[in-house]
Amino acid sequence: MIVEQFVMAYGAEQDRLRALLPEGFASLRPVLRINAEVRDGKTGALEFNTAAEKADNRGWVNIGRWDDVPFTKGGKKTTFTLPELTISFTGVGIEGGCPAEKDNVGCYYLKDGTFTLVPAEKITANKEFCDCEFAWRFAGGAHGVSLGKTLPAIPEEETTHYEKAAFTVENAAVIPCMQVLGAYQVTFER
């Protein structure tokens, strides 16, 4: 299958992320990530996750996952639309990489009440940086536009203790976007 993968990360208050994480997970960085895919030019898919560590495994924990996501293409722009979210990626013709790749053993997914680690996919194809804009459609949902550069997500010490909150898409999506940190697209065979 040919996969066009689009990835965007945005900064979010790390203390709020800590309050959401399930038992046994620790927040690595103040970041939320949206991964979107077009599979064989026909089917869209989307995931929402945050950087986390569990049992010495550093990577991501999945907050939400959608299949059969509607998408449109126009020129270099690809837009994914859900009732909860709209996100667009526009290739800018500059190749680069992702700083989080070096610190990623995989992603934890919740199934039947248990989190399972799925190893990171090895992708050797070149990545193209993208401009990106997104908006969660929940009341008070995060939204943002990229600045045309990649910014680091630097871990923050705890400064505010929030009450534990349910690990849900809506609770994560209403944490304000401090800044879109970067976005890229890559095409590969899976």
List where the protein language model places each region.
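A glycine-rich, hydrophobic loop/mini-helix early in the fold
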Residues: 40-76
